[in-house]
Amino acid sequence: DSTQGWINTMDSTSNVRGATFMCASVSGVGNTLVTVGSCKVATFKGPGSFTVNSIADCAANNAMAYMVVAAGGGGGDGGTTESGSGAGAGGFREGRNNAITPYTASPLAAACSAITATVQAYAVVIGAGGGPSSSSPSGGNGTSTAGNISSFSTITSAGGGSGISGGATA
């Protein structure tokens, strides 16, 4: 058209996208962060932190499933003539989001109990196992100790109870 000029323009705001997934890292000796399928799996063998550096624009992609297992207690000693008892296992807590992580190791896991990530560092505590009892040189009964707690964010699993030495009463 000789009287009207046309300018071809595009609005780039319609094709701009934010982050699809959250970005996270782990700290601490022996702790790892790996990709399994479309999920990131953080494994802690010692204390450290799980740090969320950025979150996804879609809230569903900010769900964090978790499994927190505490340490077991130390077994009881039988001394020279009696038997000691075994100790208790450490506590187990699991939370997940069925749509993202349908697998569960627990028949009691709550269906939608995942934690929604926010940008922060989440402390991770790995409790030590309880110590065994030891008999005294004269054959008396020693005492064992309970396992220690493990925790992630606001989730805490109790340590297992200690064993009873032979001849001891509960």
Q: PLM features: what roles do these ranges have?
A:
Residues 1-170:
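Glycine-biased low-complexity/repetitive sequence motifs
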